[in-house]
Every structure is written in structure tokens, then in C-alpha cells.
Amino acid sequence: MNILVLNAGSATLKFQVVVTDAQRIAADQDEKLIRGQIERIGGESVITLRLPDGSSRKRTAALRDLRAAVDWLVGFVTSAESGTGLSARADLHAVGHRVVHGGEQFRNSVRVDDGVLRGIEETIELAPLHNPHNLRGIEAARAALGDGVPQVAVFDTAFHQTLPEHAYLYAIPYPLYRRHKVRRYGFHGTSHRSIAYRFRKLTGRAKADVRIVTLHLGNGCSACAIKDGQSIDTSMGFTPLEGLVMGTRAGDIDAALLDYIGAKEGLSPPQVEAMLNSQSGLLGISGLTNDMRDLLAEANELRDRRARLAIEMFCYRARKYVGSYLAAMGGADAVVFAGGVGENAPEVRALICEGLQWAGLHIDADRNQALVGGQEGRFSTEGAALEAWVVPTDEELLIARDTYRAVGDGAV
């Protein structure tokens, strides 16, 4: 089955075409035909493509909106120029969509129908920055491919619906949860699920035999405690703002600071929230950038004090969460790193692991340095009681597989 995977944002569209079926999934032999992204939708859009032969291309096109972008994309991936071997729109058998928020309604990936669309619309107030664009992505794919091609919604929050009540509730008046569904939802769920699946494959362990802490570290960051294949706690909360220090997000913060900062700086509550989301984290502390690569260079080569401070705060917060999740699960088999920073910053991994010797985690410096650029493997020492791994996340592959399972062979 040829599956188009879409991740629609406000002015961006990430995509991939994956060939998968039951046999390919069982053998881990799914085929990725093409991937890329379209940026600056609404003007002169920039399109980045990774073709089947491994080559990369960039081009521009005037794409006025998301519908035009999806229509262009479908036309390109079914053209001879793309090299996919697909020659007609009918060769795309299904579309899998990343949807950020599924509320409490969606515990699994689901085939889209009118009821599902209404459910996603009802969660817009929980994810106003993401779900409207995810919905428009579904509508654009329907317009480009017709109602006969099934669409599947894969929710970032679904994996965390297994959190126990004592982990997902906030210690605020209980009626607020009953009336407004104020609770921890967690995000990056598809990524954490992907990491856990791949870790089990690499180690040959069954779901029931695995306790791991997964760290998705990129511009957005989150930690997850996974026991017996299920998420039992996660760092992001009602919104993605809670938890770890991130590229531009503050993470955990005293709630009383919102009013205090607003009063002192003359900012409204939405302005304070915007500051915590887009001007804080690594960027806010360093005053330089939210890019960990640049911060490491500033700290190591130019001895910039605030760059070093931002890195230390980032690693300290992550280490605290790992320690708390080890306590919550009564220990763990491994700490598993993923995401752009987790997969490519050995120094950051080492700093996070540095304070975990008490738990039996000891790293091999040479192995750690070697694991960059998509490499996967263990970098703890032989026999370490708590292992450390790098396992690149593959959300698009998981979305494609969920899409196949949701629609089955009947769509082909």
C-alpha cells in the first residue's frame, strides 16, 4: 500500500510517501519513496525534496494556501520526474495525518469520517496553534485525492492516554477537570512510541519486559516513562509548554510568575504566554539562539557564559526528569535519546547522563561520540545496570503503519 504521510502546519507541510503492508511491517522492510517539506506556504514557497535515488533538490513555487500545496505535492509525487514509480493519483492508496491533539476522545489512530472531524474540531480550543492546520491538511488531501481515498488521523496525545489518573491530574479543584478537561495530555506521543518500538526491536525484548525513559530532544523536548509498552508519565502537560527546557519554551515554571511578570513588564496574559513559548528556553537564557549546535560552539570556542548556562540548565532539567521517572517505575532498563539534539549532540547526552552514576549508568565516551547523523546503538559501558541508547525517532513510518492498519487491504 502506498501511503502519503502529511504533517501540516500554519505555513509548512512535511511529507513522506511510504510503501507498507502486513508483510513489510513484520519484516521491518517498509520502503520510503520520497520525503521533504514545503515552507512559506502563502507566498513564494520553498520546496525541499529527497528523491528515491537519494538525491536532494530545492525548488520554488507560488502556493497560495495549504490546499494548493497538497495539490502540487500529489501531482509531483505521481509524476515521472519524482522517480517514485507512481503514475496516477489513484496510486496513492491512503493518507496518514499527524494531528497534535485528540483530547480524551481519541486513544488510538482512527480512520477519518464526519464524526472524527467533529471530534478534532472540538479539541481546537486545546490546541489552537496546531489542530486547525491539521484539519486543513485533511481537507486539502480530500480535495486533491477525492473522498474515495481513506484518510487516517494519528494523534500525538493518544499514546499518553494510558497515564494513570494520579499522573495526569493537576492538584487543582477537581471540578475544573470535570467541567473543562484540565489535565496532563502530553505530546510527542508518536515519537515516544516509535522510539520504544525500535528499542524493543534492537534489544529483542518483549513489551512486558521493558522499562525505559525516552528523551525526545529537539527544538521541542519531552521525556516519557514507558513501562510494559505503555506511557505512565510524560513531561509535557495540558500544553507543550510544560516540562523540559526547550529551544524557545521555558518548560516548568511557577504559575504565579505569569501575573508577576505581566504586572512588572506591562504585558497581558496572552503576551506573557507568548513570551514563555517563543522567547524563553535556550534562546531566552543565552540571548543568542535556540539552536543547540550554535550554543555548543559559543560555549566551547568563545567561552560564552550564558551559552554555557543555557546548556547546563537544559541538561539539568532533563536529568531531573530521568531521575523522577526512575523512581516512578522502580528503576529502568535504559535511557533512550532521540530527536535532533538527542541524536546528534554527544556532549549534551554526556552531561545528562553525568549525574546518573548512582543508578548504574556509566557511558563509553568513544561510543557516545560515534553516535551521530542517524546512527543507532548503545553508548553505556558493557554491563551497566542502566543502559544509555541513541534510537532515532521515525514518526512518519509509524503514521504510515497506523494508516495501513486502520484501512487494511480494502483500500488498494
UniProtKB/Swiss-Prot annotation:
Pfam families: Acetate_kinase. GO terms for molecular function: acetate kinase activity; ATP binding; magnesium ion binding. Mg(2+). Can also accept Mn(2+). One of its GO terms (biological process) is acetate metabolic process. Mg(2+) binds at N7, E395. The active site is at D156. Signal peptide: none annotated. Pathway: Metabolic intermediate biosynthesis; acetyl-CoA biosynthesis; acetyl-CoA from acetate: step 1/2. Its cofactor is Mg(2+); Mn(2+). ATP binds at K14, H216, L217, G218, N219, G220, D291, M292, R293, G340, V341, G342, E343, N344. The record marks H188, R249 as: Transition state stabilizer. The keyword DNA damage does not apply. Its EC number is 2.7.2.1. Disulfide bonds: none annotated. One of its GO terms (cellular component) is cytoplasm. Substrate binds at R98. Keywords: ATP-binding, Cytoplasm, Kinase, Magnesium, Metal-binding, Nucleotide-binding, Transferase. The keyword Cytoplasm applies. It is found in: Cytoplasm. It catalyses: acetate + ATP = acetyl phosphate + ADP. It comes from the Bacteria. Belongs to the acetokinase family. Homodimer. Catalyzes the formation of acetyl phosphate from acetate and ATP. Can also catalyze the reverse reaction. HAMAP family: Acetate_kinase. This is Acetate kinase. It comes from Gemmatimonas aurantiaca (strain DSM 14586 / JCM 11422 / NBRC 100505 / T-27). The lineage of its organism: Bacteria, Pseudomonadati, Gemmatimonadota, Gemmatimonadia, Gemmatimonadales.
